[in-house]
């Protein structure tokens, strides 16, 4: 472990001293630490501190048309280290719990005006403050010189490099489509040139120079020194490679994925991403698989495993299971333990311990996969993960939020309250206000900071550590919950038009509606309004007690959040392929499995007011098509955007989000839902594109009888 840390530190310093990047062969030549080729490539691939990208090079002396293009493998230094924006802003500024550098931005640019006057800069020029030293140590870069640190920040912190004008890069004329022209506060330079991808070369009509009068004047206004200007091109290119090529090329020599012989995938060969506060759904363990009822099977985007947790380590670009993960989980659930000692390990390696804070297994990365947090699912969902939140008292003991401790007043928030606030903070698009949670304990007021995992007394300034650990579930507990009766106590609340004799404990039943029934006619009329020339062959009601209960629970939650007001609920269409019908009936709509119906208004499940729109997505090799008429809790909606992965926050309300997105606020016809609990697949319509019903033997018999009776 010590040798790996030394190697990471040396590689980082070599790269930053060389302008943030080095060709792989040159890095090997300069490296003093004794590392073999395989060991170095594993280090670069697995530690999360570097990116290996391919960058085109052109042979010297070759013309643009006949240039002998080759490619070099470049290693770039990566870091999550950032400057604190609140510290740069107006007073009172940052409270000091940000885990980011308190440093002047213009010092990084090498051109702070206070350097020339000898006056003290309010934003700080001292890297050696207790706060900054702690931040540097946390990121493992406290050994870098000032110049090396500046290079690392410039190519990783997106707030530092000047913005490129995208309008300048579009349209004709000397300023492209930029209406501000010379008054534009962004740089007028070819964005493809900065990315190393401009195919026009010297004949490009966009500027390729930072030193022309317009660009230089702009850069001087922004405070960049002449030395930094001379390095800008390589820095922009480094930043582009880190942002856009790292995930695809960081694997130096990936191992081929082995065959998946069972539903429990022992090796996960997907791309490795650095840990983030929020758990991606693709790294969640499938709750339906644990209940042995996942209809998506191999197409399921969640992990299939027999436990609600899974401990793995990174080996050769693939995640592999750790041995004795029940013992690891039991230790991890204890907040007083920050590691577990290993005397033996999987795959023939020997490591000393598994560190829960750094998530390192010896020299390599480790991770814990788990089921969804219990606060995101209805109470009757089994084997969700109960996360417990603790704070450390003055005696070094961990106290659970909302529980009575010895000599401590009870907090006004529970673990569930903290968990909900934490997930809101982790959600995409959450603003800065979501990073803190205010509460009381006795007569004292506190603030919990999710970024730093600390709580602060707002009067005395006392700071305490905070910890989040799961409630332990043994394999025996899992078996017991799987086998026990998971039905809710009391009578089931079902629609009065459902068939009570067709309610399976798990799964669903399709009930074919009589064409003469009022229920059939209602569905037919909605469908027929925009598809009058198509023939409805069959309409079935979907009876899935599990999905219905979840839908009703979601409706109650939305109603509470809406101050008790009724939630906007609509009947909307969704066209699909026959291949996905049973999976949708079993587990609801999931665009990651069933496919996208567009991304214009966000990445979610699309529903339409008109059957004619959904028909375009009702794919079939025959004349027979499938379409759902679903109940959808659209709630409060907003116009969508292609970049949305969830609805945005409401204006002025950091923890309140819209419920869905639409194509038009004045006349919405398309709705995008990101949370599947807001949908219930109520009816399945099977229809034909033929305007006449297909002839069947029964029709011929009836016609024959009619003809005979007339003789």
UniProtKB/Swiss-Prot annotation:
Q: Where, per UniProt, does this protein localize?
A: Nucleus; Golgi apparatus, trans-Golgi network; Cytoplasm, Stress granule
Could you tell me the Gene Ontology terms of the biological process aspect for this record?
protein auto-ADP-ribosylation
Catalysed reaction, written as an equation:
L-aspartyl-[protein] + NAD(+) = 4-O-(ADP-D-ribosyl)-L-aspartyl-[protein] + nicotinamide; L-cysteinyl-[protein] + NAD(+) = S-(ADP-D-ribosyl)-L-cysteinyl-[protein] + nicotinamide + H(+)
Where do the WWE domain residues begin and end? 308-371, 374-468
What does the PTM comment of the record read?
Answer: Auto-mono-ADP-ribosylated.
Q: Which InterPro entries match?
A: ARTD-AVP, Poly(ADP-ribose)pol_cat_dom, WH_PARP12, WWE_dom, WWE_dom_sf, Znf_CCCH
Which keywords does this Swiss-Prot/TrEMBL entry list? ADP-ribosylation, Cytoplasm, Glycosyltransferase, Golgi apparatus, Metal-binding, NAD, Nucleotidyltransferase, Nucleus, Phosphoprotein, Repeat, Transferase, Zinc, Zinc-finger
| Gene Ontology CC | nucleus
PTM ADP-ribosyl aspartic acid: list the residues. 610, 621
Keyword flag Disulfide bond: no
EC nos: 2.4.2.-
The segment(s) forming the PARP catalytic domain are 494-708
For the region Disordered, give the residue spans. Answer: 247-279
Which spans of this chain does the record mark as coiled coil? none
| Residues modified as ADP-ribosylcysteine | 484
* ZnF bounds (C3H1-type): 103-128, 164-188, 189-211, 280-307, 281-306
A GO term for molecular function: NAD+-protein mono-ADP-ribosyltransferase activity
Which residues are annotated as modified residue Phosphoserine in the UniProt record?
Answer: 268
Protein family per UniProt: Belongs to the ARTD/PARP family.
Under the subunit heading, UniProt states: Interacts with PARP11; this interaction plays a key role in zika virus suppression. Interacts with ISG15.
What's this chain's function?
A: Mono-ADP-ribosyltransferase that mediates mono-ADP-ribosylation of target proteins. Displays anti-alphavirus activity during IFN-gamma immune activation by directly ADP-ribosylating the alphaviral non-structural proteins nsP3 and nsP4. Acts as a component of the PRKD1-driven regulatory cascade that selectively controls a major branch of the basolateral transport pathway by catalyzing the MARylation of GOLGA1. Acts also as a key regulator of mitochondrial function, protein translation, and inflammation.
What this protein is called in its record is Protein mono-ADP-ribosyltransferase PARP12
| Primary gene name | Parp12
């Amino acid at each position: 472990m010590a040798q790996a840390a030394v190697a990471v530190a040396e590689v980082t310093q070599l790269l930053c001293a060389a302008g943030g990047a080095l060709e792989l062969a040159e890095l090997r030549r300069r490296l003093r630490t004794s590392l073999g080729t395989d060991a170095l490539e594993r280090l670069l691939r697995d530690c999360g501190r570097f990116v290996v990208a391919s960058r085109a090079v052109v042979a010297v002396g070759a013309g643009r048309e006949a240039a002998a293009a080759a490619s070099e493998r470049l290693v770039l230094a990566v870091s999550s280290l950032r400057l604190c924006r609140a510290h740069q802003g107006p007073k009172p500024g940052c409270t000091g719990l940000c885990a980011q550098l308190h440093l002047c931005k213009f010092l990084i640019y090498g051109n702070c005006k206070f350097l020339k006057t000898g006056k003290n800069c309010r934003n700080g020029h001292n890297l050696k403050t207790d706060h900054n030293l702690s931040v540097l140590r946390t990121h493992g870069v406290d050994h870098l010189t000032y110049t090396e640190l500046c290079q690392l920040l410039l190519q990783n912190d997106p707030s530092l490099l000047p913005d490129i004008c995208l309008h300048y890069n579009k349209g004709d004329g000397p300023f492209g489509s930029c209406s501000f022209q010379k008054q534009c506060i962004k740089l007028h330079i070819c964005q493809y040139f900065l990315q190393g991808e401009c195919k026009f070369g010297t004949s490009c009509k966009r500027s390729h120079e930072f030193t022309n009068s317009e660009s230089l004047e702009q850069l001087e206004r922004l405070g960049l020194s002449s030395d930094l200007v001379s390095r800008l091109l390589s820095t922009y290119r480094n930043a582009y490679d880190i942002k856009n090529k790292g995930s695809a090329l960081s694997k130096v020599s990936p191992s081929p994925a082995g065959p998946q012989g069972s539903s429990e995938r022992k090796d996960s060969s997907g791309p490795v991403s650095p840990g983030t506060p929020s758990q991606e759904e693709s790294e969640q363990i499938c709750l339906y698989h644990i209940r042995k009822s996942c209809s998506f099977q191999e197409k399921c985007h969640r992990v299939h495993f027999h436990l609600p947790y899974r401990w793995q380590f990174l080996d050769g670009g693939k995640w592999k299971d750790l041995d004795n993960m029940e013992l690891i989980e039991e230790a991890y659930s204890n907040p007083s333990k920050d590691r577990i000692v290993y005397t033996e390990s999987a795959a023939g390696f020997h490591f000393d311990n598994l560190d829960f804070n750094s998530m390192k297994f010896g020299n390599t990365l480790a991770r814990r996969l788990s089921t969804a947090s219990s606060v995101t699912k209805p109470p009757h969902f089994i084997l969700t993960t109960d996360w417990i939140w603790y704070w450390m008292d003055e005696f070094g003991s961990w106290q659970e939020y909302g529980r009575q401790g010895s000599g401590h007043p009870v907090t006004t928030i529970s673990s569930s309250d903290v968990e909900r606030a934490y997930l809101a903070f982790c959600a995409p698009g959450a603003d800065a206000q979501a990073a803190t949670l205010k509460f009381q304990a006795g007569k004292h007021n506190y603030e919990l900071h999710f970024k730093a995992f600390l709580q602060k007394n707002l009067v005395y300034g006392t700071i305490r550590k905070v910890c989040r650990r799961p409630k332990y579930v043994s394999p025996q507990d899992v078996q017991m919950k799987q086998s026990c009766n998971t039905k809710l106590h009391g009578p089931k609340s079902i629609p009065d038009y459902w068939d009570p004799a067709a309610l399976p404990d798990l799964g669903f039943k399709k009930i074919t509606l009589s064409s003469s029934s009022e229920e059939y006619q209602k569905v037919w009329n909605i469908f027929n309004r925009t598809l009058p020339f198509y023939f409805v062959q069959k309409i079935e009601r979907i009876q899935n007690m599990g999905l219905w209960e979840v839908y009703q629970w979601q409706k109650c939650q939305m109603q509470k959040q809406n101050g008790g007001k009724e939630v906007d609920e609509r009947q909307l269409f969704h066209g699909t392929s026959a291949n996905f019908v049973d999976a949708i009936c079993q587990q609801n709509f999931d665009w990651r499995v069933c496919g996208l119906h567009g991304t214009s208004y966000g990445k979610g499940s699309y529903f339409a007011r008109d059957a004619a729109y959904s028909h375009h997505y009702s794919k079939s090799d025959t004349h027979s098509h499938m379409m759902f008429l679903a109940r959808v809790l659209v709630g409060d909606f907003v116009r969508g955007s292609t970049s949305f992965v969830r609805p945005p926050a409401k204006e002025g309300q950091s923890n309140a989000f819209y419920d869905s997105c639409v194509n038009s606020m004045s006349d919405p016809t398309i709705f995008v839902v990101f949370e599947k609990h807001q949908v219930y697949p109520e009816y399945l319509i099977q229809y034909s594109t033929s305007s006449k019903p297909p002839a069947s033997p029964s029709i011929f018999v009836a016609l024959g009888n009619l003809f005979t009776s007339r003789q």
